[in-house]
Each structure stands twice: as C-alpha cells, then as structure tokens.
C-alpha cells in the first residue's frame, strides 16, 4: 500500500462493502498484524493450508500414472482439516451515492475513483460487464480514452474494469486529471458515456471488435502450458467446471448488444456507487 496509488482499491472497497470481508485488506491492517500472535497464524495455517482446501494442477508432457504416484508420495501424509464452511455475510445494496476522500502521501496527481457492486464471477452478467469495460477503456480507440485523453485532453489516463470475484464483483472506474482539470469534470465526462451505453446500443462493428479483442486475450492467456494450468486451476476452484476452458469463448461470443445496454442500466446507476476523491497528502 506504500506504492503510489497502492491503496486505491482499498479506498473503494472499504466504502462499498460494510459487511462482507471484501471491504478489508487480504492480510489485514497494520493494527491487525500487530495484534496477532504466532498461535493465530498457526491456527490459520492449520485450517486453510490443507490438501482438502487446495487445487493442484500438473500440466505438460507427463506420465499420468507416474504423476499420480508422485502426488501420493509427496502429499498423502499431509493431514486434512475440517471442511472450510464459508458463511459470509450478504452485502446490503447501495441505494444512494457514497462520497469519500482518501489521502495518499505518495502521489502528486489526484485520482477520481468510482466503484459499483456487481455480480459474482460465475455469472453471465459478470462477463457482460467485462465486455463493457473493454468497450469503455481498453485501448486508444475505446470511447473513454478517445474522448477524455485524445480528443478533449482532460485526462492523463482513464480505465474501467470489472473485478469479478467469488461472491461479488467490483466495477471500478479510474481517471487521472490533466493539469487543472477537476475530478468533478472527469466524473461528468464518464457519466455522459455511461448514460449513452445505458440508452443506446453499441454498433455491430464495435461488438465484433470487442469479441475479437476478448478472443485474442483468451488465446494469449492460454498459449503456454503455464497459462493453461492456471486457467484450469481457476475454473475448478471458482467455477467447479474445468470444461469452461473449452466453452468460455462461446459464452462471450453469444453476448448481445442488448445485454450490454441492459446490464449497464441495471448496475451502473449513480445511486448505486461510491465516489472517492483520491488526493495527495
């Protein structure tokens, strides 16, 4: 968190999630680490770092029977723990805009941060939101980059991303102002483009470009043995379906312009978000 802009995600999530642990840092705050003793760490390790709570992927040109024997040899003696039961609290929906200010001593340029709670990662809507973020800010031809960085010279950078996780997603928007441009000006520019997406269909050509971009990203991600292994691990751990490595592209290809509009209209509303002025200081 000491890196420039290192706390921006926490600045958003700590305001979005008041009940669910997504509102906390993964390893905790300094006060949490200071308060913990060695027994706390041992208990955590004994509960979570066990074979029945792990996914092992062995990939490559392997002998399957020999590999199974090696796995048995090196892992069979490690005791399992009780099954981990996660009964995490449900987050209340946001019904009015939350405004917050965060100070980062390691930056000189302020940032506008906007966050929304979105569906969990194994839903179709999460994939639609990923396509939407690509449309808005992925590359120099994206609508927000072209408008705010190239044409109007308002921003040094602008980015949107749907950070989908196991229980919820976080749709994050980030913009850095150019010169004396205010954060409110950046917000109004972003909001205008969001309203367009919510009320107008993108073009067939744009949809085709988006699908081609996502297909390229998918192929590149799985172009190596390591990439395939990581994908299989994620699909099994978070989706319970390794077959998605063969079918996920088809899901993205089937997403329509109407779905993009409808999902934006459902989740990206001004009364459902957190706005953070991320300032030097």
Pin down the residues of each PLM region.
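A generic secondary-structure signal for well-formed alpha-helical elements
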Residues: 1, 62, 66, 74-82, ...
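M16 family metallopeptidases and their MPP-like homologs
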Residues: 4-31, 53-59, 110-120, 146-254, ...
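Non-catalytic, conformational "gating/processing" segments within enzyme and secreted inhibitor domains
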Residues: 5, 38-74, 272
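Short beta-strand/turn micro-motifs at beta-sheet edges
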Residues: 42-46, 99-102, 157-163
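Proteolytic maturation boundary segments
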Residues: 63-103, 247-281
């Amino acid at each position: 968190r000491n890196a420039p802009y290192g706390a921006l995600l926490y600045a958003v999530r700590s305001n979005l999630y008041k009940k669910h642990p997504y509102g906390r840092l993964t390893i905790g705050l300094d006060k949490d680490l200071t308060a913990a003793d060695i027994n706390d760490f041992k208990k955590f390790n004994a509960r979570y770092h066990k074979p029945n709570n792990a996914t092992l992927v062995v990939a490559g040109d392997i002998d399957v029977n020999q590999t199974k024997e090696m796995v048995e040899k090196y892992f069979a003696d490690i005791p399992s723990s009780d099954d981990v039961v996660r009964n995490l609290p449900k987050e209340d929906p946001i019904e009015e805009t939350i405004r917050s200010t965060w100070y980062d001593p390691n930056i000189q340029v302020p940032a506008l941060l906007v966050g929304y709670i979105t569906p969990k990662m194994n839903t179709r809507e999460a994939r639609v939101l990923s396509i939407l973020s690509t449309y808005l800010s992925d590359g120099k031809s994206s609508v927000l980059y072209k408008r705010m960085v190239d044409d109007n010279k308002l921003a040094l950078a602008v980015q949107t991303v749907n950070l989908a996780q196991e229980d919820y997603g976080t749709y994050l928007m980030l913009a850095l102002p150019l010169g004396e441009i205010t954060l409110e000006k950046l917000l109004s520019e972003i909001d205008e483009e969001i309203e367009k997406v919510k009320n107008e269909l993108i073009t067939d050509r744009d949809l085709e470009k988006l699908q081609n971009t996502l297909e390229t990203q998918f192929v590149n991600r799985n172009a190596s043995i390591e990439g395939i292994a990581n994908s299989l691990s994620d699909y099994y751990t978070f989706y319970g379906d390794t077959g998605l490595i063969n079918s996920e592209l088809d899901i993205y290809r089937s997403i329509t312009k109407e779905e993009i509009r409808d999902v934006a209209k459902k989740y990206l509303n001004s009364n459902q978000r957190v706005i953070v002025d991320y300032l030097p200081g």
